[in-house]
């Protein structure tokens, strides 16, 4: 018996099914509920019946006090890897039915994480499996445009080397790499 994929609302047959959050998905439809990154079995966490990647789960649901070294009760724990061994059903012959409703499915979301608008191919920069506008791919702190390989990420936000070092690096560090003592 096939079920309906919650992402694309099409039938899921045993040969193409993965089970997550008590639901049957197509392998490519098991995606983070927030950023739509494709997830692997055991590499996601569940919240309110929806799968999330580690980055989004931590950013959206971790409790205050995380940076202070306190214990976080609501932290990311990968969901257990579940393999299903349901018998393979023969694929039914194709039928040609008239759809009763129009279903719009966006399999490859291209919304920029910074501005939320659609990023088209000619203005696109891909970083961490997300599509950014080239103009939006800038330091979160000083808004300086970033060059490939010359940036750092912290909690899903991108920074130029100088801002990252000043915010998250050890105190007393200078751009020369030497510790200044007076």
Curated annotation (Swiss-Prot):
Its main location: other. The keyword Cytoplasm applies. Disruption phenotype: Cells exhibit normal growth, but display altered morphology and F-actin distribution. They show changes in chemotactic motility associated with increased pseudopod formation, are significantly impaired in growth under stress conditions and highly sensitive to osmotic shock. Signal peptide: none annotated. It is found in: Cell projection, Pseudopodium; Cytoplasm, Cell cortex; Cytoplasm, Cytoskeleton. Residues 3-63, 110-170 form the LIM zinc-binding domain. It comes from the Eukaryota. Keywords: Actin-binding, Cell projection, Chemotaxis, Cytoplasm, Cytoskeleton, LIM domain, Metal-binding, Repeat, Zinc. One of its GO terms (biological process) is response to osmotic stress. The keyword Cytoplasm applies. SMART domains: LIM. InterPro entries: Znf_LIM. One of its GO terms (molecular function) is metal ion binding. One of its GO terms (cellular component) is exocytic vesicle. Binds to F-actin and may modulate the chemotactic response during early development and contribute to the maintenance of the strength of the actin cytoskeleton. This is LIM domain-containing protein C.
């Amino acid at each position: 018996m096939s079920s309906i994929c919650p992402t694309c609302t099409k039938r899921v047959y045993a040969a193409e099914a993965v089970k997550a959050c008590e639901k049957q998905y197509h392998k490519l439809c098991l995606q983070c509920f927030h950023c739509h990154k494709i997830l692997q079995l055991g590499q996601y966490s569940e919240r309110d019946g929806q799968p999330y990647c580690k980055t989004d789960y931590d950013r959206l649901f971790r409790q205050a006090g995380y940076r202070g070294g306190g214990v976080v009760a609501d932290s990311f724990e990968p969901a257990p890897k579940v393999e299903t061994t349901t018998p393979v059903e023969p694929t039914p012959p194709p039928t040609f039915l008239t759809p009763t409703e129009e279903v719009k499915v966006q399999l490859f979301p291209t919304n920029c994480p910074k501005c939320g608008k659609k990023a088209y191919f000619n203005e696109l920069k891909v970083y961490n499996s997300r599509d950014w506008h080239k103009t939006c791919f800038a330091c979160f702190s000083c808004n300086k445009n970033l060059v490939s390989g010359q940036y750092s990420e912290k909690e899903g936000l991108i920074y130029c080397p100088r801002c990252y070092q000043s915010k998250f690096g050890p105190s007393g560090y200078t751009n020369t790499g030497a510790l200044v003592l007076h």
